[in-house]
Structure formats: C-alpha cells, structure tokens
C-alpha cells in the first residue's frame, strides 16, 4: 500500500500552497488579462464590423444619391433639349407665318398695282378714244381724211409717250 509519511504530507501541503500562490499570483492575473484582451479584441472586431457596415450603408447611400443626381441631370438635359426643340419649332412657325404674311402682302400690292395700271390704261384708252372721236367729229370728212386723222392722232400719242 501506499504509505504516507510526514515529509510527503509537508511536500503535498507545500505543493498545494505553491499551486495556490501560483494560481493567485500568476495564473489568475494571466487568465484575467487574456480574457480582458480577448474581450477587447472582440469589442474591436465588433466595432470594426459596425464601422464597416456603416461605411457600406454610407457608400450605398452615396451611390443612390449619385444615381439620383445622374438621373436628374439626364432629366434636365432632356427637358432642355425638348425646350430647345420647342423654341426652334416656334421660331420656324413664326418665320413661316411672317413669310406667308409678306408673300400675301406682296401679292396684294402686286394686285393693287396691276389694278391701278389697268384703271390708268383704261382711263387713257377712254381719253384717247374721246380725243380721237372729238377730232373726227370736228372734221366731218371723208374716209381718207378720217384715216389720216387717226394716224396723226396715234403718232401724236406715240410722240407724247401715251401709247
């Protein structure tokens, strides 16, 4: 059997006291420190993950804002393009209306000039007919004399530039 003597008991008590002191002085502070360090590392990892998620959310938000700004830019450019086309179309329509107005006015003026010239020509013809008739009536003469008078009247009118 196993025999226990006093030395063995003292050694056992000394060893247990040494283990107790080691536990209190070295192991416990070491394990406390490692637990504390482990918790600090976990805390830092959690904080880093939290910051990474926040950064990702910020990035997504900025990407969304950039996308919205780009879409707004496209809308503004499209709207500006439509306005420019509208302005050009309106200007073309206005130019077309002015062109038509000017052409109508020119046609009316030409028609008035034509009518005025026709009235003046008719007035001259009537005047000439009256002049010739009065000359013929003044001299009631034969046919030869009549033709001679008409020729003289025509030549006279040609000289004056009325015919």
UniProtKB/Swiss-Prot annotation:
It is found in: Cell inner membrane. One of its GO terms (molecular function) is proton-transporting ATPase activity, rotational mechanism. Pfam families: ATP-synt_B. GO terms for cellular component: plasma membrane; proton-transporting ATP synthase complex. The chain crosses the membrane at residues 1-21. Its main location: membrane. Keywords: ATP synthesis, Cell inner membrane, Cell membrane, CF(0), Hydrogen ion transport, Ion transport, Membrane, Transmembrane, Transmembrane helix, Transport. It is a single-pass membrane protein. Belongs to the ATPase B chain family. F(1)F(0) ATP synthase produces ATP from ADP in the presence of a proton or sodium gradient. F-type ATPases consist of two structural domains, F(1) containing the extramembraneous catalytic core and F(0) containing the membrane proton channel, linked together by a central stalk and a peripheral stalk. During catalysis, ATP synthesis in the catalytic domain of F(1) is coupled via a rotary mechanism of the central stalk subunits to proton translocation. Component of the F(0) channel, it forms part of the peripheral stalk, linking F(1) to F(0). NCBIfam families: ATP_synt_b. PANTHER family: ATP SYNTHASE SUBUNIT B', CHLOROPLASTIC. F-type ATPases have 2 components, F(1) - the catalytic core - and F(0) - the membrane proton channel. F(1) has five subunits: alpha(3), beta(3), gamma(1), delta(1), epsilon(1). F(0) has three main subunits: a(1), b(2) and c(10-14). The alpha and beta chains form an alternating ring which encloses part of the gamma chain. F(1) is attached to F(0) by a central stalk formed by the gamma and epsilon chains, while a peripheral stalk is formed by the delta and b chains. This is ATP synthase subunit b. The gene is atpF.
